[in-house]
Amino acid sequence: MDTLNTYVGSFIFMAYSGYYKPIHPQKYRGNPTNIVYRSLWERKFMVFCDNNPSILQWGSEEIIIPYRAPDGKIRRYYPDFYIKVREKSGKVTKYIIEVKPKKQTQPPNVKNKKTAKYRNEALTYAKNQTKWSAAREYCEDRQMNFLILTEDHLGV
């Protein structure tokens, strides 16, 4: 993870989506002609993965993790990224990474409990926690690491 922390310092978040065309398509796990980003943070992370020589392989929404949603239904979670990194020590480590605004990683403010905004934030938080719990389990079973990157990690 040393490598990842070294290079992600200059990201900006904006609501933005499109298709990313990799410079190094051989590094991409999946179809390199159909790489979708759903935010500018994701796009910049794609550029980082594509151009960083320590990242041996990467993918975006290429892994499917089944989970039981708060409504009891079985659903599928597509984490934002999979990366395989050669650490400075030479060790190869695999990560599943979710890129999210910090606000969505924390419980909503209880002071506003009666508002629609609170209910929406509480539902988003509960859904995210359920998905991320399934992702941690998935990673643990496969000797991988699960990370959530927020604006704090991305230097925004």
Predicted regions and their residues:
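Electrostatic, structured charged patches in enzyme active sites and in nucleic-acid/phosphate-binding
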Residues: 2-156
